[in-house]
Swiss-Prot record:
EC number per UniProt: 3.6.1.-
Family: Belongs to the Maf family. YceF subfamily.
Residues the UniProt record annotates as site (Important for substrate specificity): 14, 72, 156
Pfam families on file: Maf
HAMAP family found in the cross-reference section: Maf
GO cellular component: cytoplasm
Top-level division of the source organism's lineage: Bacteria
Record GO terms (molecular function): nucleoside triphosphate diphosphatase activity
Function in brief: Nucleoside triphosphate pyrophosphatase that hydrolyzes 7-methyl-GTP (m(7)GTP). May have a dual role in cell division arrest and in preventing the incorporation of modified nucleotides into cellular nucleic acids.
Organism: Aromatoleum aromaticum (strain DSM 19018 / LMG 30748 / EbN1) (Azoarcus sp. (strain EbN1))
A GO biological-process term: nucleotide metabolic process
Protein name (record): 7-methyl-GTP pyrophosphatase
Cofactor(s) needed by this chain: a divalent metal cation
């Protein structure tokens, strides 16, 4: 075996629940990475870089582990919308996104701390938002509090009601951990799935 344990570099309950679908034992660890986009960085590049940085940050503390990192950025016409952090910012993001098609770039990285091998894939999802009224946006933000969610919409919960449609290769990508891509990477590391 080329690793001693599997570690998810995230404290997200949604990512943890998704990874549990693989029925593999794993731990979680906070990555403590600055998620600020670099100047002139394209949205998929930001997501890829942060997914790898998160996995590497945790791999330093778990030198025999296989570490999974993930990151998601929402982009509207090339502009990145990260985690809003405040109610006002969440409302502002959703006001900008109403009626628009937003691309959610979700990257997943696997770092084998023992061998140094790094794998990363990016899975985009196109999301068409409804024409939302200000009242709908305020009600949603008040009920859901999507302050820690790229683009301010949690599709795995009440946020699904904000959408007209979505399209992508992996339905789990929009929730924050693309399991189809991840299963490919874990099999490449020797894990037996299923």
């Amino acid at each position: 075996m080329r690793y001693s344990k599997l570690v998810l570099a995230s404290t997200s309950a949604y990512r943890r629940l998704l990874l549990e679908r693989f029925q593999l034992p794993f731990e979680t660890a906070r990555p403590d990475v600055d998620e600020t986009p670099l100047p002139n960085e394209m949205p998929p590049d930001t997501a890829n870089r942060l997914a790898v940085e998160k996995a590497r940050a945790v791999a330093v503390r778990h030198p025999d582990a296989l570490v999974i990192g993930s990151d998601q950025v929402a982009a509207l016409n090339g502009e990145i919308f990260g985690k809003p952090g405040t109610v006002a910012a969440a409302i502002g993001q959703l006001q900008r996104m109403r009626g628009a098609t937003v691309i959610f770039h979700t990257a997943v990285a696997v770092v084998n701390a023992r061998t140094g091998q790094v794998r990363c894939e990016n899975v985009p999802t196109r999301v068409k938002f409804r024409e939302l009224s200000d009242d709908e946006i305020v009600r949603y933000v008040d009920k859901e509090r999507p302050l820690d969610c790229a683009g301010s919409a949690k599709s795995e919960a009440l946020g699904i009601t904000l959408l007209d449609s979505l399209s992508g290769d992996d339905p789990t990508a929009l929730v924050g951990l693309p399991l189809i891509a991840l299963s490919r990477m874990l099999r490449a590391e020797g894990l037996l799935l299923p």
